[in-house]
Amino acid sequence: MPVKDSSSNKKNQIGKLSERQRRILEVITDAVSLRGYPPSIREIGDAAGLQSTSSVAYQLKELEKKGYLRRDPNKPRAVDVRALPDPIPSKPGRKPGPKKSSVAISPDPAETSPTSFVPIVGSIAAGNPILAEENVDGYFPFPSEIVGDGDLFMLQVEGESMRDAGILHHDWVVVRSQPVAEQGEFVAALIEGEATVKEFHSDSSGVWLLPHNDAFDPIPAEHAEIMGKVVSILRKL
């Protein structure tokens, strides 16, 4: 039985890219080179002419299958470009442009401090991972000494229920993902598909999510899903 040349097959497979897939690779490598972290799903879609996040997710999976990308299943937005396709052959009479480099430009360590790129989460659906691709709108850089470590994400506060605690309408909160909370901690919780920020409280009468505004009532939390603990607040003045 003849033995197939697997390396030759792989080479043929890795060359089969559409123009759109080439564009997606360019967008990712350019973003990593310029700012040190990959673009969001929506940024990729805008640059590649894809309207839906599911279409972008599909193209990323195809690029991963073809060996151009490697993705960390535990970090939905971690994307590592493994290879770049050969340049598209130029038309007769034209010189090919310079070949792009896939090497990311590293900032001078002396001018930088440890930074956490925190995903900005838009709408959250019950039962879906918080950091699922379709939930993340982008990233925001924070000094690690401010937000700490762990799996972090950002939510924008809607409403005045935490006003007296200094958490105002349209503030951004940085949340460390964890399924449990301690007494008195501010948490982000999911109730009937809606995210809310409240104080966690437990006593003989049950578990409650407490507002910090007398105009709002405590919320029973028996059926709430604790998404994490609020660790920082960001406000635009």
Curated annotation (Swiss-Prot):
Residue numbers spanned by region Disordered: 1-20, 67-112
Segments of skewed composition (Basic and acidic residues): 67-80
Biological function: Represses a number of genes involved in the response to DNA damage (SOS response), including recA and lexA. In the presence of single-stranded DNA, RecA interacts with LexA causing an autocatalytic cleavage which disrupts the DNA-binding part of LexA, leading to derepression of the SOS regulon and eventually DNA repair.
Any one of the GO BP annotations: negative regulation of DNA-templated transcription
UniProt xrefs under SUPFAM superfamilies: LexA/Signal peptidase, Winged helix' DNA-binding domain
Family: Belongs to the peptidase S24 family.
UniProt enzyme class: hydrolase
Gene designation: lexA
EC number: 3.4.21.88
DNA-binding region(s) in UniProt: 41-61
Keyword Hydrolase recorded: yes
Polar residues compositional bias, start-end: 1-12
One Pfam family cited in the UniProt record for this chain: Peptidase_S24
Site (Cleavage) location in chain: 126-127
Subunit details: Homodimer.
List of catalytic residues: 161, 198
Record-given protein name: LexA repressor
Annotated GO MF terms: DNA binding; serine-type endopeptidase activity
